[in-house]
Amino acid sequence: MEFSVKSGSPEKQRSACIVVGVFEPRRLSPIAEQLDKISDGYISALLRRGELEGKVGQTLLLHHVPNILSERILLIGCGKERELDERQYKQVIQKTINTLNDTGSMEAVCFLTELHVKGRNTYWKVRQAVETAKETLYTFDQLKSNKTEPRRPLRKMVFNVPTRRELTSGERAIQHGLAIASGIKAAKDLGNMPPNICNAAYLASQARQLADAFSTNTVTRVIGEQQMKELGMHAYLAVGHGSQNESLMSVIEYKGNPNKDAKPIVLVGKGLTFDSGGISIKPAEGMDEMKYDMCGAATVYGVMRVVAELQLPLNVVGVLAGCENMPGGRAYRPGDILTTMSGQTVEVLNTDAEGRLVLCDALTYVERFEPELVIDIATLTGACVVALGNHLTGLMSNHNPLAHELIGASEQAGDRAWRLPLGEEYYEQLDSNFADMANIGGRAGGAITAGCFLSRFTRKYSWAHLDIAGTAWRSGKNKGATGRPVALLSQFLLNRAGLNGDD
């Protein structure tokens, strides 16, 4: 799908469709008022007859409006004008895209980017429109025999901006939006792949392909089980012992900073390509969704794609910690004591608390990069879903400025996170009679004790942990990976690169 920006009057547009907003109760937006005036009150007359109230997502498609050059006008309800916020704006864009795609409008000029969204500028509105459009049209049908496609799908969208001065900002928003949407799609595609295809070797192949595509400043190294053993990554290795598939850690290094020696930002993604729970096996119901336990690694892959496509002036390292947790004769057991790469020992009380065992060794491994900061991303705990539901990503950090940066980026990107505490009281729940710590701390505060566990392996750098167990995928009728938090982390890196889109 092609996107562009322009600045022009609605009555002069010669297009298959013009999209304008209507507020409650039956109030025309400024652009709709212009069209109404040109058409001698045609639109307002329809509204007076009750054709459209203006509630969020309501639509009315008009054909051959008098004195208008475009074939059709799509009126879209935007709710109450003063209440139009980020969430409603994206809902309106989503409904617009679906309506245009379903009604055979192959191209359209959209004036919704001129609506006032409190605290948001043209860059934000255009970028969110691009990302939302791509999200709305996303399908995962690679493995289906019969693929369905609209007879006349939407192929071109032009976003109108109020003044010519804002064209540059709009064009930059499209560039960033397309790159982020591409990263989100890449993460979703990986997440949606079945575990018989997407194993640690598949993740490694994708990481290598990314480096090949951006070979001027990107390289990928893959660390196998023999090298992990030599490095002392016994916690990581233990998790994969029950699987026929080799554990592989893919390390993607991108050097975009003119100062090649600048300390990198490191992203570490949990990549459990299937999590049966191991010996502490999960219930059968919903176990198919445990293919999504690699969405942390998928996020890192998607973000690295965004970084490379935009050629951000940063040094960034992405780690995909690939592994599979299966029961078997070689599987690790409750009661085992593992020596981690850091030298700390862990008593295994539950083999289904495996993600932290993979991550703790990966977090120790990345010390060699002398990182500016490290962020790990993991579908780590069901407790985080209980605490925050499916709307907010859980955030924990040992560094307040980093936590504040990430929360700010999450608000900018519309990919929200919420900070949880790391208090000494929670650390005590991890005490073990037989090792330095246990791998679980009981039911109470489970998301926090998991973060506390990881923090014991991050004392040499600034660190943040994103628990995406509630936000990485949807269940039910619309089951599928969401691609979160690619947008959050991409925004964080754009901000770090000084490309945050502020006018």
Curated annotation (Swiss-Prot):
Pfam family, one: Peptidase_M17_N
Keywords: Aminopeptidase, Cytoplasm, Hydrolase, Manganese, Metal-binding, Protease
Annotated binding of Mn(2+) 1, by residue: D275, D352, E354
InterPro entries: Leucine_aapep/pepB, Macro_dom-like, Peptidase_M17_C, Peptidase_M17_leu_NH2_pept, Peptidase_M17_N
Function text: Presumably involved in the processing and regular turnover of intracellular proteins. Catalyzes the removal of unsubstituted N-terminal amino acids from various peptides.
Keyword Cytoplasm among UniProt keywords: yes
The organism of origin for this protein: Yersinia pestis
Name of this chain's protein: Probable cytosol aminopeptidase
Example GO molecular function: aminopeptidase activity
EC number assigned by the record: 3.4.11.1, 3.4.11.10
GO biological processes: proteolysis
Superkingdom of the source species: Bacteria
Assigned protein family: Belongs to the peptidase M17 family.
UniProt enzyme class: hydrolase
